[in-house]
Amino acid sequence: MANDLVQARDNSQVFGVARIYASFNDTFVHVTDLSGKETIARVTGGMKVKADRDESSPYAAMLAAQDVAAKCKEVGITAVHVKIRATGGTRTKTPGPGGQAALRALARSGLRIGRIEDVTPVPSDSTRKKGGRRGRRL
């Protein structure tokens, strides 16, 4: 009986929360504790590449996620719940190109993935959309 409890403790995971914000300009990978109060690691795509146009690329997001995963393992976090977010509001509600890549990189780096949740802010009745009455004219 006691051996079963010890094995259960050995198999238990230490969870954090990975918040991935993927816009079309940049990708943030931010890991906190479960309460969200303490930041464990935060890396952006812009910190990993030199060219501004590459900040939101899947490659930059992958590098950022690998960096975050390494820091998490140092601290002792073995699993993460993922909250992925797009710009939202009156802007686009689909995550940018780096979102999927960051999630895959977290999974492949050895962190266990718990729940995956989309937390993009969706307005119930929003402010007026940018662009004026006749829209954006090209």
UniProtKB/Swiss-Prot annotation:
Q: Where is this region: Disordered?
A: 118-138
* Alphabetized Pfam families for the sequence: Ribosomal_S11 (PF00411)
Q: Which GO terms describe its cellular component?
A: cytosol; cytosolic small ribosomal subunit; nucleolus; small-subunit processome
The alphabetized UniProt keywords are: Cytoplasm, Nucleus, Ribonucleoprotein, Ribosomal protein, Ribosome biogenesis, rRNA processing
Q: Which Gene Ontology biological process is one annotated for this entry?
A: ribosomal small subunit assembly
In which organism is this protein found?
Saccharomyces cerevisiae (strain ATCC 204508 / S288c)
Disulphide linkage map: none
Point to the regions of Basic residues compositional bias. 129-138
Where does this protein reside within or beyond the cell? Cytoplasm; Nucleus, Nucleolus
The Swiss-Prot or TrEMBL record describes its family as follows:
Belongs to the universal ribosomal protein uS11 family.
What is this protein identified as?
Small ribosomal subunit protein uS11B
* Superkingdom, natural source: Eukaryota
Q: Name one GO molecular function term.
A: structural constituent of ribosome
Concerning InterPro entries, the annotation shows: Ribosomal_uS11, Ribosomal_uS11_CS, Ribosomal_uS11_sf
PROSITE patterns tied to this protein: RIBOSOMAL_S11 (PS00054)
Q: Does the keyword Ribosomal protein apply?
A: yes
Q: Which residues form a coiled coil?
A: none
Quaternary structure (record): Component of the small ribosomal subunit (SSU). Mature yeast ribosomes consist of a small (40S) and a large (60S) subunit. The 40S small subunit contains 1 molecule of ribosomal RNA (18S rRNA) and 33 different proteins (encoded by 57 genes). The large 60S subunit contains 3 rRNA molecules (25S, 5.8S and 5S rRNA) and 46 different proteins (encoded by 81 genes). uS11 interacts with eS1 forming part of the mRNA exit tunnel. uS11 interacts with snoRNA U3. uS11 interacts with MPP10. Component of the ribosomal small subunit (SSU) processome composed of at least 40 protein subunits and snoRNA U3.
| Other remarks in the entry | Present with 3370 molecules/cell in log phase SD medium.
Role according to the record: Component of the ribosome, a large ribonucleoprotein complex responsible for the synthesis of proteins in the cell. The small ribosomal subunit (SSU) binds messenger RNAs (mRNAs) and translates the encoded message by selecting cognate aminoacyl-transfer RNA (tRNA) molecules. The large subunit (LSU) contains the ribosomal catalytic site termed the peptidyl transferase center (PTC), which catalyzes the formation of peptide bonds, thereby polymerizing the amino acids delivered by tRNAs into a polypeptide chain.
Query: PANTHER family attached here?
Result: 40S RIBOSOMAL PROTEIN S14/30S RIBOSOMAL PROTEIN S11 (PTHR11759)
Gene3D superfamilies assigned to the protein according to its UniProt record, in alphabetical order = Ribosomal protein S11
